[in-house]
Structure formats: structure tokens, C-alpha cells
């Protein structure tokens, strides 16, 4: 599995992979990472990366020829994703599906985004990470890589970590409680469910499913209504 990130700001992307789980996964060659500076593909001698809008309006958009040149430099086969607020919301099912791809390319928007022709000519999919605006697509790209990489075999030390996570069964994950003794009086005022400690895994599983549904109903009524059973 390989990820290629096309961005005007490589320095915003690379530090994320210098620690923790994804660093170890890279060191084990469980996936590859390539970060390309879009400016290197600008035809302008000053590496200008943007243009004004036809018809006027505030802001600039990314040079479509620069984006095209950058995409052409990335070898096929590849699955190209543009990060933009106009895209569909990224979901857990997308992460699971994309983890089966051999090469995912993520193109990070900036300024007012992309010339529409860049999307029409280059994008296999367009994603956003929520109904809000960021200054660029780098954070979105990192979110996607992190979410996808967790589904690559070996990245997580314990594959069972994926089984009961939020969204895996359409509901939010059930509440978790640390197996430890605490000095804090405030923490001890809220005991963990007794069933968690009794060792009956079938009953624990049923309780967690019930709590998972309650949590989903409280925090994400939209999801609860979609999958109520």
C-alpha cells in the first residue's frame, strides 16, 4: 500500500509520521509514504501556484496545470482523492474500502480550492471530513491516511482493536473503563458497570451493545435512526 500526498506545504504533512503507530508501520514497510510539493510542478519560473477567479470574487484557486503535471508524475495504477469542502463526507466504510487499494493519491486543496477542471480530469473521488472549512486539505489528507492505514494488516498491534470501534457495527463504541484503582474521589464516585468485571463475556457483549445503542442515540441520533433494529 502506498500513499502519495500532493500539497503546497509538505512540512505540514511529514511530522505526523515521526512518532507513534504510523511511524512504526512505515519502519516495518507496512505502507509507503510519498509527499510531493505541488510548486515543483508549476510551469511558472517563480513557482506561482494560484490564479484569480474568472468572473471575479475573493481569493485564488490552485493552478490546474500544476495539479495536472503533479498527477501525471505519479505512476499508475493509482486512486486519486481530492480533499475539498465540496466533497462527500468521509466515513469508516470508505476507510475499509480504500485500505484494499494499492496506491492512494491525496491532493490537498488551498485558497478557494480547485479549478473545477482539475476535479473533472483528475479525481476518482472527492472527500471532506465534515461540514466546516479549513485553510487547506492537509489535515483532511492526514485524517484519511490515519483512518485507512489502521485497516492495513499489521499496522495495529492487536487486530481485535478494530472489531468494536465506533462505526464498525453502525453504532458508536460502548463506554470503556480503565482496569485500575484510583485515588481520585471524583472518579470513584462513578463506578464502572459491575457486569464488566464478572467475566461472562456473552453478557458483557450484550451489555456493551445496549450501551452502544444508547450512546449513539444520545450523541448521534441521525446514525441511530438509520440503523435502529
UniProtKB/Swiss-Prot annotation:
Molecular function per GO: tRNA (guanine(37)-N1)-methyltransferase activity
GO biological process terms on file: tRNA N1-guanine methylation
Enzyme Commission number(s) of this protein: 2.1.1.228
Binding locations of S-adenosyl-L-methionine: 109, 129-134
One Pfam family here: tRNA_m1G_MT
Keyword Signal (UniProt): no
InterPro entries for the chain: Alpha/beta_knot_MTases, tRNA_m1G_MeTrfase_C_sf, tRNA_m1G_MeTrfase_TrmD, tRNA_m1G_MTases_N, tRNA_MeTrfase_TRMD/TRM10
Keyword Cytoplasm among UniProt keywords: yes
Catalytic EC class: transferase
One cellular-component annotation, GO: cytosol
Compartment list: Cytoplasm
Record's catalysed reaction(s): guanosine(37) in tRNA + S-adenosyl-L-methionine = N(1)-methylguanosine(37) in tRNA + S-adenosyl-L-homocysteine + H(+)
Keyword line: Cytoplasm, Methyltransferase, S-adenosyl-L-methionine, Transferase, tRNA processing
Coiled-coil residue spans: none
NCBIfam families assigned: PRK00026.1 (NF000648), trmD (TIGR00088)
Family label: Belongs to the RNA methyltransferase TrmD family.
Subunit structure: Homodimer.
Main function: Specifically methylates guanosine-37 in various tRNAs.
Protein known as: tRNA (guanine-N(1)-)-methyltransferase
Species annotation: Helicobacter pylori (strain Shi470)
Amino acid at each position: 500500500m502506498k500513499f502519495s500526498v500532493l500539497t503546497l506545504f509538505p512540512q505540514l504533512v511529514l511530522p505526523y509520521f515521526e512518532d507513534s503507530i504510523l511511524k512504526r508501520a512505515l519502519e516495518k514497510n507496512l505502507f509507503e509514504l510519498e509527499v510531493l510539493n505541488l510548486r515543483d510542478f508549476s510551469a511558472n519560473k517563480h513557482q506561482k501556484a494560484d490564479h484569480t477567479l474568472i468572473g471575479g470574487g475573493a481569493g485564488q484557486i490552485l493552478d490546474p496545470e500544476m495539479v495536472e503535471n503533479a498527477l501525471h508524475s505519479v505512476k499508475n495504477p493509482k486512486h486519486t482523492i481530492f480533499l475539498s469542502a465540496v466533497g462527500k463526507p468521509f466515513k469508516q466504510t470508505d476507510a475499509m474500502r480504500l485500505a484494499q487499494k494499492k496506491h492512494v493519491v491525496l491532493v490537498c486543496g488551498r485558497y478557494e480550492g480547485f479549478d473545477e477542471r482539475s476535479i473533472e480530469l483528475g479525481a476518482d473521488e472527492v472527500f471532506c471530513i465534515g461540514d466546516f472549512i479549513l485553510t487547506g486539505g492537509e489535515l483532511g489528507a492526514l485524517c484519511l491516511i490515519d483512518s485507512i492505514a489502521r485497516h492495513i494488516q499489521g499496522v495495529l498491534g492487536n487486530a481485535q482493536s478494530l472489531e468494536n470501534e465506533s462505526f464498525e457495527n453502525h453504532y458508536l463504541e460502548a463506554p470503556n473503563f480503565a482496569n485500575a484503582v484510583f485515588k481520585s474521589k471524583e472518579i470513584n464516585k462513578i463506578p464502572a458497570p459491575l457486569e464488566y468485571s464478572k467475566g461472562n463475556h456473552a453478557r458483557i457483549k450484550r451489555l456493551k451493545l445496549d450501551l452502544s445503542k444508547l450512546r449513539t442515540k444520545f450523541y448521534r441520533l441521525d446514525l441511530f435512526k438509520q440503523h435502529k433494529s
